[in-house]
Amino acid sequence: MTLIEFYDKARIENIAGALLARADKLILVGDQRKAMERSKPVYEELIKERGRSTEVCYVTVNKNNLQNIIEKLDEVIDGNDECIFDLTGGDDLFLVAAGTLIERFAGKVMCHRFNLKNSTVTDCDADGNTVSVESFDVSIEENIKLYGGRIIDNGYKFTFDDEFNRDANNIWSIAKNDLRYWNFCSITIKNIMENCNKAEGLNITYSADARDTTGRKGGSYGLNESFLRSLEASGLIHSLKYGDEVSFSFKNEAVMNVISTPGKMLEVIVASKLSEIKDELGNKLYNDIRVGVMIDWSSEDEQSPTLNEIDVLAMKDAIPIFISCKSGIFDADELYKLQTVATRFGEDYAKKVIVFTSPEMLRGNLEFIRGRADDMGIRRIENPDGISDAEFERLLKSVYLN
């Protein structure tokens, strides 16, 4: 079987058929010779990683010359058996050319179209029936590779299993009661671990004097006993001793990472709740989720690499969802960063979301940020600590639809 794909800037459209079907050959047709040449080894690697052997090649045409497109496609059909046009991508003239050749080679050439937003395929040359595709799961790694980037190992990688999700929800239950205080305590624990911890690994031991020096002058904030007792009661720490010397042990490395990394809690609870959401059949709605994804990429005219970190990145089938999480003051630059990375690694398929707490902290910038987010097609989830968990989950369940 030979798949003929009309090369599109939304690169998932160029390889969707080859990822789903066992094609002998994938032929890219378009006017962007350099782009197709760069894409060829990337597509071959992605297909090979799925255990398939597909030859990838490309044919260059003049996209503004219908006769040239028809002639080139005619040559492709003559030189290959069982040709199938994928009409998912491509400009109008490509589709006109395909229609001409489907009529000319009736019975020899077939065509279909994928709807990647709802995982269906339409048989365009027969009865026009639309059927669901059982599984079109693209991983985060595959999606980033597809668009010419790579993921850099950026510290701890969370596993969102049942136990960790319970821990994440326990952390959220404590933190959302007073997010500013949580952030302060997280910074305090980080400082203790870096500057005055007498123990190692998951164990923390520090003196009262050290504890006092991390406190806020003239205020009641600090790493007080009630805060630590709440962590202990939720099973997040154990063996707590509170006196002239304070000591405790974190439950595990994942919990320690969340509690001792300022800002990590919001990212983790967003990812955790995404991992727990089910579809109508009881299957996980989002097939891949990661926190703190550092992407190394360069645009086609840049020599030096560009690095961007996405707080939470999720995949719904082949749809990437880029999520920025802010638990403090931020400005509109964060929206532009989100827009740039999402467009680069998803084009029109990418979904963009910003989750932020304490909107009142933005003061005069709040309405401007809301307006810019709306103009840029960025979904806003505001003040998640002020809504029920059910409402928070409802909002997260629909982020791939915006």
Annotated model-derived regions:
Residues 5, 9-24, 338-339:
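Histidine-anchored nucleotide/phosphate-binding helix
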Residues 6, 55-68, 326-329, 384-385:
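Short beta->alpha junction loops
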Residues 30-35, 115-120, 354-363:
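Short beta-alpha junction loops
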Residues 14-17, 37-40, 93-100, 124, ...:
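A short acidic (Asp/Glu
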Residues 25-108:
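A broadly used, surface-exposed interaction patch
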Residues 114-160:
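Beta-rich, aromatic/charged-enriched effector core domains that present basic-aromatic interfaces
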Residues 83-84, 103-125:
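Short, acidic/small-residue loops that bind anionic groups at enzyme active sites
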Residues 145-402:
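Intrinsically disordered, low-complexity Ser/Thr/Pro/Gly-rich regulatory segments
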